[in-house]
């Protein structure tokens, strides 16, 4: 097999789109903590000195939206207007309504449950139509593709050296990107690393490049993967002072590839942040990852993509497919059988299995929803692997 070059990117928690994701999920967490059955579809947008929160929320709880916005901005590090927005002084606009009753009637009681109320897992219908995908690979311990894993780690390291004042001239906004050369379908070397980070205006460019390479890149990347041909692009425009919501308007749901698998598999188009778990865009995508990770952990294949489609108001998935990219150790039909016999992809079953009605979403709103070994996430567990091994 010829060598190929594959690339993934990530962004820091201070990227304007990620700021919006974190605000939306912080609001969701606050609501679901008080009212686990709340229906939340919370969107956020941001620009210079302004945050707007909008969407549809049905809940018995009360949360102070403005306080959550300011707290989230402050935790990220936006405490100075020069950075693009100041948590203490920014304007906040809210425009929130209840969930449409037309949608609610299909979610509260699915098509199947209306006909036969004997199965509790038929109760919830999917909150919308659409497709979701999950993916896992054995090329890293996290089950993520190496370019994405490294991009996330570099982005987190940027935030760490900023917050710990190792590089005290850094500002919150930043992006990372890694290109890996694959040989015979396995990572061989790193072709290129891109790091762009917001900074104070009086920083010497050459000093910044030296600092970022020493304190960020070489602290994360295995030097055995770097050779004399590896390219480093550090703030390649030469200047990144204007950033955050001042540099680019931010919007919830615009980093869906960063949130998932870095372009290594399909994506149904639905974002995660700000959505309660009755939305299959989120819950079923987490479940598809859970399945794929267990299938790979069981040794049924080296790579696995799992896809589901849903109809609004219907509990059972309309379709399910898998792709093992030619790495399957048994027939794919047998893997499908194993999935069907061990996993229930109806929304209520997913919510119960993964315990999704809890305030866990703010933590995954930056640096990826998957492969998070720093968190105890239910959809990252491989507790079905032993049961799946019997199909080998």
Curated annotation (Swiss-Prot):
* Residues binding Mg(2+), per UniProt: 17
Annotated region (Flexible loop) at: 99-109
The record lists K(+) as bound by 43
Indicate yes or no for the key word Cytoplasm. yes
Chief location of this protein within or outside the cell: cytoplasm
A Pfam family annotated for this UniProt entry: S-AdoMet_synt_M
Cofactor dependence = Mg(2+); K(+)
Taxonomic superkingdom? Bacteria
Q: Which GO terms describe its cellular component?
A: cytoplasm
Which UniProt keywords are listed? ATP-binding, Cytoplasm, Magnesium, Metal-binding, Nucleotide-binding, One-carbon metabolism, Potassium, Transferase
Subcellular location, record wording? Cytoplasm
Q: Which residues bind ATP?
A: 15, 173-175, 239-240, 248, 254-255, 271, 275
| Listed EC numbers | 2.5.1.6
Cysteine disulfide partners in this protein: none
Q: Name one GO molecular function term.
A: magnesium ion binding
Q: Which reaction does it catalyse?
A: L-methionine + ATP + H2O = S-adenosyl-L-methionine + phosphate + diphosphate
Looking at the keywords, is Zinc present?
A: no
One GO biological process this protein is involved in is: one-carbon metabolic process
* Alphabetical list of NCBIfam families matching this protein: metK (TIGR01034)
The family classification in the record reads: Belongs to the AdoMet synthase family.
* Subunit and partners: Homotetramer; dimer of dimers.
* The protein's name in its UniProt record: S-adenosylmethionine synthase
